[in-house]
Design a protein with these regions (language model features):
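Class I S-adenosyl-L-methionine-dependent methyltransferase catalytic core
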Residues: 1-241
Length: 241
């Protein structure tokens, strides 16, 4: 699973899944990557559907899942928007049910396409960009404006498959601020997602990625913050009247 630039620990996803769902319910992750959400679902006796553009990532999930001797969840290789628009395909999987939780860790625009700085330099590692894929449909290859527009579309197309009072969980990480730009991506996304009819922002948690080390970036000439954390944002689908 280390082939992915930003894998999520299955234990973290298991805890989130157990909090928001019951056993045997269904979870969707349409940016599944190397399958942290799917592994978390198997660890908590839930069912999950994962979608990803990369066959390499899906294979890595299946290999890890086999080594852990867990139930293999359903995966679909393809562009998430194309798959979500395929109502027949999703409804065949759900078999007259709905997802109780949609948990996603989207590629943050073209963040991973940028040359590495900071920790990579300190460790004498490659500073080359590490995009998720080279596919033009990959949200990780879009600028922030394009990403935001397409990402909001994915939520709108996935909403019909989520049960009333079901939850969305969205991971996001901010960029370092630049002159004239705060780059508070989590705040930007909260405002945009909260505009979607039928969906309400209900709060967040902050997850610290302990695999990232602290370094005195900029010292002693300037202040550059360490960004070890990601925001886990929670939204709830309204009950239809």
């Amino acid at each position: 699973r280390k082939i992915h630039p930003s894998p999520k620990p299955p234990q973290l996803m298991r805890d989130i899944i157990k909090f928001f769902t019951k056993e045997n319910e269904h979870i969707l992750d349409y940016f599944m990557g190397v399958g942290g959400t799917l592994l978390g679902a198997s660890l908590s006796n839930r069912n999950a559907l994962g979608i990803d553009l990369s066959s390499k990532f899906i294979s890595a999930y299946k290999k890890a899942n086999k080594e852990l001797k867990l139930k293999e969840q359903t995966t679909i290789k393809g562009d998430c928007l194309d798959v979500l628009k395929n109502k027949k395909l999703i409804e065949e999987y759900l078999n007259n049910k709905k997802f109780s939780l949609i948990a996603i860790d989207p590629p943050y625009g073209d963040m991973m396409n940028r040359e590495k700085t900071g920790e990579a330099i300190k460790k004498n590692q490659s500073t080359d960009a590490t995009p998720f894929t080279k596919n033009k449909k990959d949200l990780g290859n879009m600028n922030w404006s394009e990403f935001r527009e397409n990402f909001i579309e994915t939520i709108k197309y996935s909403m019909p498959y989520l049960k009333d009072r079901g939850h969305y969980v969205v991971f996001i990480k901010d960029l370092q601020p630049k002159e004239g730009k705060t780059n508070l991506l989590h705040s930007d996304l909260i405002e945009e997602i909260n505009k979607i009819e039928g969906l309400n922002y209900i709060g967040m948690k902050i997850w610290v990625d302990e695999s990232i080390n602290l370094y005195p970036y900029g010292y002693p000439h300037s202040f550059v913050s360490n960004q070890l954390h990601q925001y886990i944002m929670f939204f709830r689908k309204k009950l239809k009247k």
